[in-house]
Amino acid sequence: MFSESLPEDKPVLEVALTELPMVAESLPEDGSGLEVTCDLRLEHKPARTLLLVGRSGNGKSATGNSILGRKAFKSKGRASGVTTACELQSSTLPNGQIINVIDTPGLFSLSPSTEFTCREILRCFSLTKEGIDAVLLVFSLKNRLTEEEKSALFALKILFGSKIVDYMIVVFTNEDSLEDDGDTFEEYLEDSPDFKEILEPCNDRKVLFRNRSNAPVSQKAKQVQELLNYVEEIARLNGKSYMADLSHEIRENETAFQIKQQEILEMKGLYTRQEMLQMKKDMEKSFENQQLRQMMERVETELRETKERLEQQLKEEKSARLELEKRAKEVEKRSSDVVKELNDEQAKRLESESRAKEAVKQSNGVVENLNKELARIKQMATDLQKSKQWCIIM
């Protein structure tokens, strides 16, 4: 059977392939009870570069190690985190594909260390050759979601640009904490509406990672493959790496910097060693400040444009709300006028009915009086007729 723990010096898939013959020997000759899906075709795939971002202590470094299949990054189970600068490590999969992983310090906060954050972002892109293929936003299931993490997408859009979400995969670490609480992953997300707001813009791309060394090899291989499937999906949907243009620009600036360095070296005989060192130091500082200034200007521009966009959105929403209120008042007024008209018509109708009833009543009284008068006249006529007959007899 596969080893229950992963050797530190071998990638997951390499271990799986190494142990596959031993697994085969332990199976029945007829292969009963075995269902295997295995595709060992050495299909050429381009190198992929993955960027790990998230709060310090969420397990970014451990996740990077799981992806690479070796302890490439320093990782300790503590909230403060151990990564202090961007670092790139690589591994080659059994199919020949190269996977590059960039680990970062916490890059959520826009203040007070904006300059440090910008320096590290520049370093991220200087480490990549063809841009970034996927951004892995790492959360820990054992930690409560902080206010800083709730605004993660906003911060990342400001720092990396609004298109960052098209390249994002959400990675959840510390799966074992769910087992301790007796919850399923789906139940956890159902009770966390903030995560729904984060996952929706990312097309619900999410992977559950177990980074502990005692995790089964098969589980580690499965979670890494699930992640890489998402990476290929992102590459297919977007057609190119993220910020490849910026990476090329940084490398072009570095090339220009190296040319300047060479020019200084060629002037070696014209200046003292101290003067040469000072010139080199000044040039390095100027180059770094130039890149940093450009990056900070981009971040400030993004912040300003975001602020203006939000203000415009609020203005439009306020205008729309006022328009709705105006229309509601107009409808209410029209409704009130209609109700008043209906009430007036009903009052007139009731008054008309009352008058009609009164007229009928009066008419009935007149008819009754006429009938009485007619009966009296008839009686008088009868009496008169009788009186005449009596006179004739006499």
UniProtKB/Swiss-Prot annotation:
Domain of life, source organism: Eukaryota
Keywords: Coiled coil, GTP-binding, Nucleotide-binding
Chain intervals for the UniProt region annotation (G1): 54-61
Protein name: Immune-associated nucleotide-binding protein 12
Start and end residues of each stretch annotated as G3: 103-106
Coiled-coil regions, chain positions: 289-387
Gene name, Swiss-Prot/TrEMBL: IAN12
Similarity field: Belongs to the TRAFAC class TrmE-Era-EngA-EngB-Septin-like GTPase superfamily. AIG1/Toc34/Toc159-like paraseptin GTPase family. IAN subfamily.
Protein induction: Down-regulated by aphid infection, 2-aminoethoxyvinylglycine (AVG), high CO(2), isoxaben, and propiconazole treatments. Up-regulated by brassinolides.
Region: G4, residue numbers: 173-176
Residues that hold GTP according to the record: 54-62, 75, 211
InterPro entries cross-referenced by the UniProt entry: G_AIG1, GIMA/IAN/Toc, P-loop_NTPase
Chain ranges of the AIG1-type G domain: 45-251
GO molecular function: GTP binding
Region (G5): 210-212
